[in-house]
């Protein structure tokens, strides 16, 4: 199910104790469209708030989300650093999630093995102030109330490979096709959904975008709730999910 709405408001309307897993990647607040590494921007969202306001918005959303989660539910947040690592947004998120009462499960490093054209070196060949591009992102995993989950449908091989907190796979390569500037690849929600949920579980993505989490949910036999601000993204996400076949 795709809901076209402002997630900061709509999460308050979700049923209490109804969500088993959250898999999401909120806007990174890196000024997409004016960012020299990404000239594409969101259709309906200005990705350039003052950092304090941005963090307060996210904190408010996850505070409102807490009563909507079942006990033991996991919350997985994919986020990148800003300014070549000088602004550690992931650290701020960990801090406010702990303040809200979420339990830390793990922090996974997603090695994308991708760096933009390195034409800006800072102080080239000098220790003064070199630039440190970050070809990786974080996947922060939290839990509500307790750390135990018993029902899963992942294989032994998947568990062995994915329980190492360093994941290496390529970023999404079809963003131009879909017209969205910041999609994650199906591999990211696939691993999180299989690690932290089971068939029939209800998965929420409050920043649904092109519905990639929903596509994987349908393939894997999970229920899906996606919230997205932009109407065109909602329509394309709906079409993607409808066209997706269930994996037996």
Language model features with spans:
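Core catalytic lobe of class I
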Residues: 1-236, 242
């Amino acid at each position: 199910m795709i809901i076209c709405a402002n997630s900061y408001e709509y999460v308050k309307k979700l049923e209490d104790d109804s969500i088993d897993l959250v898999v999401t990647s909120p806007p990174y607040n890196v000024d997409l469209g004016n960012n020299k590494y990404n000239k594409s921007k969101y259709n309906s969202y200005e990705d350039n708030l003052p950092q304090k306001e941005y963090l307060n918005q996210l904190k408010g959303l996850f505070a409102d989300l807490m009563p909507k989660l079942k006990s033991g539910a996991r919350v997985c947040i994919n986020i990148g650093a800003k300014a070549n690592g000088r602004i550690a947004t992931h650290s701020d998120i960990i801090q406010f999630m702990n303040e809200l009462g979420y339990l830390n499960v793990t922090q996974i490093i997603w090695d994308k093995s991708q760096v933009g054209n390195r034409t800006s070196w800072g102080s080239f060949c000098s220790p003064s102030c070199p630039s440190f591009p970050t070809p990786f992102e974080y996947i922060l995993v939290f839990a509500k109330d307790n750390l135990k989950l018993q029902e899963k449908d992942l294989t032994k091989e998947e568990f062995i490979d994915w329980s190492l907190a360093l994941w290496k796979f390529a970023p999404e390569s079809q963003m131009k096709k879909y017209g969205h500037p910041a999609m994650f690849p199906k591999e990211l929600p696939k691993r999180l959904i299989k690690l932290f949920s089971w068939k029939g579980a209800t998965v929420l993505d409050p920043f649904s975008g092109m519905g990639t989490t929903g596509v994987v949910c349908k393939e894997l036999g999970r229920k899906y709730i996606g919230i997205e601000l932009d109407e065109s993204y909602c329509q394309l996400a709906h079409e993607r999910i409808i066209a997706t076949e269930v994996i037996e």
